[in-house]
Amino acid sequence: YLNCSFLTAAWPAPKSAQPHSVPDFHARMGSGPIVLMSYNRVNGYAAECERTVFLDEPSPREPELFVLVMEARSLALSMVRPGVSCSSIDEATQELFRARGYGEHILHRTGHGIGLGNHEQPWISCGGSDILQENMVISVEPALYFDDIGGFRHSDTVLVTNNGYELLTRYPDDLEHLIVKRQNWIAAIKGALIRKAIHF
């Protein structure tokens, strides 16, 4: 017997520049960047997955920001393994953003624990004392936020394994698959989920 629940939300630009805002009920989706979020719970255990999507071709600057956030995500994931301090992961991603001139667009930590609660220890945050241990489940979600453009955030639920990590959420993360044309965006997202589920 499985007890499952699902919550999805979408933050259209410019609200996507506010990481935990509540969009106006009547807000219309622009072309992007739109942050899509899915919180899922199975038998009491939580998982989350977030992606930045576009309902039209991104502006010339948006792909650069998208790629930078994905680079920070790859950096953070490369550090995930038992014995690593969570603060060192956050420090590394923040340093990457600062080195590229985007330090003032960091609004929150790189990640957090996830399990019985949606946000719990360990905190992947500068100055924290948490150390990753095997079988911890965390989110990895480095992000950048721009008042004039919107937010760029990708979150995955990640299991810490004995020698690294395993992604527990599987959803396309490349820009090509996250540009969906306005008239078919729901069908495109549904199709991507089904294709991923078939290969699960």
Each model region followed by its residue ranges:
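Active-site neighborhoods and metal-handling regions in enzymes and metal-associated proteins
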Residues: Y1-F200
